[in-house]
Amino acid sequence: MRQLLYLAAGMLIGAAAHAAAVQPRDIVSLNHVALATANFDEAAKFYTDVMGFPQAFAFREPDGSPRLSYFQVSRNTFVELMPVSQERPAGFVHFGLEVTNLDAVVQRLRARGMDVKDPSVSPRTKSRVAVARTPQGVVVELLEFGPGSLHRKAMTDWKD
């Protein structure tokens, strides 16, 4: 009976170890959803005044017009808002996933046939980012937040 118990325990431990190896945990969470809007000021006011999401950080064009703003939904979740352009109609633009090891995620996704651009550091947010596209055409940003990134600062400064 004892041997049977040890056998069952060993099988369970082995199965758990296999599951952990098969399901990488380096994709941490959904970090943001990016939306384009024809009326940036109205949309920004909606996210702050109606939804109650504080603006975490923002960037402007040289002429002073908005480039993009991040509104913080929770400690780790944001809405990225940007104006429409000829290349970017109103609506959903992309979503961003926080990862702990960007290089490993990029390598794994490429090995599985996904087209992923080489990682780079965003000059604005200071986050490492790689952009991918799903087979359905959805743009996905894979983001790794170092201590100097604006995302990391906003997440660290969040008050519950």
Specify the residue positions occupied by each region the protein language model found:
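Vicinal oxygen chelate
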Residues: 2-4, 18-26, 29-39, 59, 69-72, 86-110, 128-133, ...
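Core segments of cupin and vicinal oxygen chelate
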Residues: 25-28, 34-78, 134
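Short loop/beta submotifs within extracellular cysteine-rich repeat domains
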Residues: 77-79, 88-89, 150-151
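Conserved beta-strand in the GNAT
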Residues: 80-82, 141
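Bacterial N-terminal signal peptides
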Residues: 3-15
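Short amphipathic alpha-helices in soluble, non-transmembrane regions
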Residues: 48-50, 108-112
